[in-house]
Amino acid sequence: MPNEDIEGKTKIIQEIEDPNLVRIVTKNVLTANDAEIKASISGIADEKTAQTCNIFKLLKQHNIPTAYQSRNDNNSFIAKKCKMVPIECVIRRRPYGSYFKRHPDAVVDQTFDPLLLEFYHKHAVVVPRIQRRVPRYKNNLQIQHLPENEIKWSDTNTTDSPDPSFSGVDIFTDPLIEFDQNPEAIATGVWHLYPAKQPRTANQEPLHKIVPVVGDEEIYFIKNSLMIPTFEVIENAWKKFNVTLVDMKIEVGYTRDGELVVSDVIDNDSWRIWPNGDPKQQLDKQAFRDAPSKLSVVEENYKTVTQYTNKF
């Protein structure tokens, strides 16, 4: 029989009778900036579910491995049950967002060819504030089991009220993983984690060093069989409507059969898209980040994106 549901910020994962499958239910919620910005929008779940189903159907048509099985109803779909890999896989055609924060001299009309591939860890790094020159304290994060004067991991769960015991630490969410560009990381099998939203100084020490969560062969597969093909298929679909796919993120996981697949969701929260290549015409969630009070604009944008993806 089905067990307990797993509820996150924007979706609920429900077990069903088939132990190999789950039902993914989208909530009428948008969040941004590590859930500092949150809004309820009636009907947004239906739009996001339609977008995800349209995208995964497109990927399956191009033989890209995905967890997606079928749409269930207006705000849910059925997918293979996966053990998620705790990394966020980002593909960039153009610089934006955290890339500009790490590379303030970059220009917006720069193009990455080949695509720029980045990995971020899904856990936060918690560092005693005295160790960092540039603090980044996120007071909405719940940090568990923090030893005194030690670097520690924690899931980036949100809480309505910050714990005062966290006031002496800096919390770096979704740290950037460095392994390809770092000879030591390759030689020793260590991943180095750096702040995702700060420039790197010369000889800067990483926030933390960890044992890799997947091996070199898996990273190669994720890059070349999941990340690049996924981006290129979706990029070509958007090009038909003269919409630029600037960047996007995906998550991956292992099915119960051990297959590594694109999983979770891909919807208007997952990318930046600019009609006519113009950032002022953005249709994605960046509009919500920039002006969270203009929910009617955000709602219309999501409806427009659904209409586009219906034609993919």
Regions found by a protein language model. Name each.
Residues 1-247, 254-312:
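Acidic/polar, glycine-anchored loop/turn motif associated with catalytic or activation segments
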